[in-house]
Regions:
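Conserved catalytic core of the tyrosine transesterase superfamily
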Residues: 1-144
């Protein structure tokens, strides 16, 4: 109506748009968390899975942060992980002793067998020797 010069003032000018509800992410219950943390690892891939689960739980990482980690982002001597999160902000996060033990063994014993001749700095590798993806992590989580 303003464009056609029927009215001079926009009657909706001071009306605020309704706020959309943000849905909370699905969280695991205590039983589900215990099941994940008590995951038994026997193979290189299972040990990788355990290392990922321990690190996510211990450090409160987002899945995107986890799958983008490189080997040099983990400092085993100083017990921390360096993460680039949302907005490319760097965070230094301490790693629990349990997660550190699992990560140490994964990096030294199991990760080299997963490389399959590829050269990559990615910390967590797929069965093809390349960096694991978000979808790959969620698939693993659903299988456990």
């Amino acid at each position: 109506m303003m464009k056609k010069n029927v009215i001079n003032i926009n009657p909706c000018e001071k009306i605020e748009s309704p706020k959309l509800k943000k849905s909370l992410p699905k969280v695991l219950n205590v039983e589900e968390v215990n099941k994940l943390l008590n995951y038994e690892a026997k193979t290189a891939l299972e040990y990788r899975n355990k290392a990922m689960l321990e690190l996510v739980y211990s450090c409160g990482l987002r899945v995107s942060e986890l799958v983008n980690l490189n080997v040099n982002d983990i400092n085993l001597n100083e017990c921390y992980v360096s993460v680039f999160g949302k907005g490319k902000k760097q965070r230094i996060i301490p790693i629990s002793s349990i997660a550190l033990k699992v990560l140490d063994e994964y990096i030294k014993v199991y990760r080299p067998t997963l490389l399959k001749g590829y050269l990559t700095d990615k910390l967590f590798l797929s069965s093809y020797g390349k960096g694991i993806t978000r979808q790959g992590f969620f698939k693993i989580l659903n299988e456990i």
